[in-house]
């Protein structure tokens, strides 16, 4: 378990965090440039000390980004090694479906609850390696606000935290000589789970390449309120139907499916227009009140 190094809980949050740091660096550098000449009672030595402090903050941010990149690269290298050396066997979604239906191999679903609750494989066992972080402490709230501001409102990607009970929960359900098919939505978290399980003594592991999202309708027997391909989307992009998964679904479903999202788009445009007109009218009303 200690060999797994996953500093980033989800890719969107990582990209949002980097964007935030870049904006922070630009803002602080502009502050330094504006303080090059002393203003009021501020001494030149104070400005220089402040500038040095900002430079150090930027250096720390860059070091964090570099460490994250190195850790991710190292993790991918380890995961590739597991597959290359045959320690974890690779299955396509169709092969996984055959193994489940013909050989009764268990499927371990390691997706977070936000994805699992939408669609799942019939008869699968659910133990998330990362799950939605519902804590209300200051650190978690800060992460959620940052994630939302940096694109979470559009993609609907939740804030996730590592499930420290993952291994113990799996060990409760499956002996270590079990043949386990491990799957997630896109394939990355399930590889991380395979590494944890292999290091814990599970040696008959099968990884679903591309995740459940890459499965065709006939590959696996599913249950839930949505198609399996749509379980990983969310946010405003899902509401408008502007995701690759929904476009692929629309190509199969036809115009009736597209009409729903077209109507939603028109509704959003009309609502935005009404808000704009209402704001203008309110502004005129306030000006008239001030004139009297």
Curated annotation (Swiss-Prot):
Key words of the record: Chloroplast, Plastid, Transit peptide
Superkingdom assignment: Eukaryota
FT transit peptide: 1-56
The keyword Thylakoid is annotated on this UniProt entry: no
Pfam families: Rhodanese
InterPro entries the UniProt entry points to: Rhodanese-like_dom, Rhodanese-like_dom_sf, STR11-like
Domain Rhodanese, first and last residues per copy: 101-224
Key word Transit peptide present: yes
Compartments in which it is found: Plastid, Chloroplast
Residues at the active site: 184
Gene Ontology CC entries for this record: chloroplast; cytosol
Bridged cysteine pairs (disulfide): none
Signal peptide range in chain numbering: none
Main subcellular location of this protein, as a coarse class: plastid
UniProt-listed PANTHER family: RHODANESE-LIKE DOMAIN-CONTAINING PROTEIN 11, CHLOROPLASTIC
Protein name: Rhodanese-like domain-containing protein 11, chloroplastic
Classification of source organism: Eukaryota, Viridiplantae, Streptophyta, Embryophyta, Tracheophyta
């Amino acid at each position: 378990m200690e060999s797994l190094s996953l500093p980033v809980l989800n890719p969107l949050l990582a990209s949002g965090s980097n964007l935030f740091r870049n904006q922070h660096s630009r803002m602080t550098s502009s502050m330094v440039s504006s303080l090059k000449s002393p203003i009021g009672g501020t001494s030149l030595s104070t400005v220089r000390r402040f500038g040095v402090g900002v430079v150090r903050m930027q250096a720390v941010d860059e070091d964090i980004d570099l460490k994250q990149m190195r850790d991710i690269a190292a993790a991918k290298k380890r995961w590739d090694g597991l597959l290359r050396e045959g320690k974890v066997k690779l299955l396509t979604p169709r092969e996984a479906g055959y193994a489940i239906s013909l050989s009764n191999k268990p499927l371990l679903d390691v997706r977070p609850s936000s994805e699992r609750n939408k669609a799942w494989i019939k008869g699968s066992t659910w133990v998330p390696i990362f799950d939605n972080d519902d804590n209300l402490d200051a650190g978690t709230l800060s992460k959620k606000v940052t994630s939302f501001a940096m694109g979470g409102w559009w993609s609907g990607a939740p804030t996730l935290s590592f499930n420290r009970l993952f291994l113990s929960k799996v060990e409760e359900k499956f002996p270590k000589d079990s043949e386990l098919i491990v799957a997630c939505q896109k394939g990355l978290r399930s590889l991380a789970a395979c590494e944890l399980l292999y290091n814990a003594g599970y040696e008959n592991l099968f990884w679903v390449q591309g995740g459940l999202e890459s499965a065709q309708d006939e590959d696996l027997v599913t249950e839930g309120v949505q198609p399996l391909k749509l379980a990983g989307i969310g946010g405003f992009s899902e509401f408008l139907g502007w995701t690759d998964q929904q476009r692929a679904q629309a190509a199969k479903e036809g115009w009736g499916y597209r009409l729903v999202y077209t109507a939603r788009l028109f509704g959003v445009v009309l609502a935005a227009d009404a808000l704009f007109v209402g704001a203008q009218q309110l502004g005129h009303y306030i000006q008239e009140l001030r004139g009297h």
